[in-house]
Curated annotation (Swiss-Prot):
One of its GO terms (cellular component) is extracellular space. Transforming growth factor beta-3 proprotein: The precursor proprotein is cleaved in the Golgi apparatus to form Transforming growth factor beta-3 (TGF-beta-3) and Latency-associated peptide (LAP) chains, which remain non-covalently linked, rendering TGF-beta-3 inactive. CDD domains: TGF_beta_TGFB3 (cd19386). Glycans are attached at residues 72, 133, 140. Residues 1-21 form the signal peptide. This is Transforming growth factor beta-3 proprotein. The keyword Phosphoprotein does not apply. The lineage of its organism: Eukaryota, Metazoa, Chordata, Craniata, Vertebrata. Disulfide bonds join 304-313, 312-375, 341-406, 345-408.
């Protein structure tokens, strides 16, 4: 008897599925959502910085050039990283992801340019060496979250080839029993195209440097196979030696600014090869990682901002730090698109709602609970901010601050 009643209830729920095709989470109006989102962002930023209240705004009129340069480099790096990983369906959801990261920039140690060149072959340069001093953060080895090596590729109009493969290596201590290099990454690059920043993930390498200072012998960018040129079929062309035709800003002689030209010297330093380190301050990390979640692709800004989609989608929301939050202590950016998710969620039996009938029955028996699908964020991106605590400038990365896509869940 009880089984028959259950079957009747399930049948009625299936029949009602079409009429109950909208989520119960769709009754909120946009103004209400915006107010809630603004307040959530206020608390989120303070929480990620481990601040109990907003710091007093700085009276400094001008931001130091090196601080602004660090902010711009970090922002550009994050844009590149998330652009390259747009197809990655996984996202870490750990405590280390949550809290803000302190940003450090280390420029390449400048020296005589010939010290940056390696001539494995007798007729030309095949490698470039990049050295860095990261000893100032050695005590924070366990707090390293990410490290990126960035170098600006410049066009080479006199190049004999249109494309060349380069490979990045960690230089190891000389030992007859092990290799002298450790491969990190490789890229196929145009030699004459417009200038572009190249980024390489060197987290493991820098972590080793922080752990053992003597292991920091620098990085090497080399052509794929020094001293040889290959035919399209893979055969080696004897007696034709390949040399590096990729040019890098800050390491090639063409960049010599001349004596006394402070403006060009400053520009060269801004564009010189450098490391960007993201460190988690010890006071912001109390617990071990909280695990990872696999996420599926959702409706993103590319679709939602171009279409008048009424169902669940990401909606644009610009937050002005001064006008919306009443904050003067954040110097850069002045505001950003935080965005939010809103819209009805289809309440139909599908791959994502296989148990919709069971959820419906649960809703009937538990009217106060919410088992209906809601429009929620799926993919989020970080935000880089420049702010002052007293007279000390800080550049930090705040994770998961920009909603890029949504899903029904």
């Amino acid at each position: 008897m009880h089984l028959q009643r259950a079957l009747v209830v399930l049948a009625l729920l299936n029949f009602a599925t079409v009429s109950l095709s909208m989520s119960t989470c769709t009754t909120l109006d946009f103004d209400h959502i915006k107010r809630k989102r603004v307040e959530a962002i206020r608390g989120q930023i303070l929480s990620k910085l481990r601040l109990t209240s907003p710091p007093d705004p700085s009276m400094l009129a001008n931001i130091p050039t090196q601080v602004l340069d660090l902010y711009n480099s970090t922002r550009e790096l994050l844009e590149e990283v998330h652009g390259e990983r747009g197809d990655d369906c996984t996202q870490e959801n750990t405590e280390s992801e949550y809290y803000a990261k302190e940003i450090y920039k280390f420029d390449m140690i400048q020296g005589l340019e010939e010290h940056n060149d390696l001539a494995v072959c007798p007729k030309g340069i095949t490698s470039k060496i990049f050295r860095f001093n990261v000893s100032s953060v050695e005590k924070n080895e366990t707090n390293l979250f990410r490290a990126e090596f960035r170098v600006l590729r410049m066009p080479n109009p006199s190049s004999k080839r249109s494309e060349q493969r380069i490979e990045l290596f960690q230089i190891l201590q000389p030992d007859e029993h092990i290799a002298k290099q450790r491969y990190i990454d490789g890229k196929n690059l145009p030699t004459r195209g417009a200038a572009e920043w190249l980024s390489f993930d060197v987290t493991d390498t820098v972590r080793e440097w922080l752990l053992r200072r003597e292991s920091n012998l620098g990085l090497e960018i080399s052509i794929h196979c020094p001293c040889h040129t290959f035919q399209p079929n893979g055969d080696i062309l004897e007696n034709i030696q390949e040399v590096m035709e990729i040019k890098f800003k800050g390491v090639d002689s063409e960049d010599d600014p001349g004596r006394g030209d402070l403006g060009r010297l400053k520009k060269k330093k801004e564009h010189s090869p450098h490391l960007i380190l993201m460190m988690i301050p010890p006071d912001r990390l109390d617990n071990p990682g909280l695990g990872a979640q696999r996420k599926k692709r959702a409706l993103d800004t590319n679709y939602c901002f171009r279409n008048l989609e009424e169902n669940c989608c990401v909606r644009p929301l610009y937050i002005d730090f001064r006008q919306d939050l009443g904050w003067k202590w954040v110097h850069e950016p002045k505001g950003y698109y935080a965005n939010f998710c809103s819209g009805p969620c289809p309440y139909l039996r599908s791959a994502d709602t296989t148990h919709s009938s069971v959820l419906g029955l649960y809703n009937t028996l538990n009217p106060e609970a919410s088992a209906s699908p809601c429009c929620v964020p799926q993919d989020l991106e970080p935000l880089t901010i420049l702010y002052y605590v007293g007279r000390t400038a800080k550049v930090e990365q705040l994770s998961n601050m920009v909603v890029k896509s949504c899903k029904c869940s």
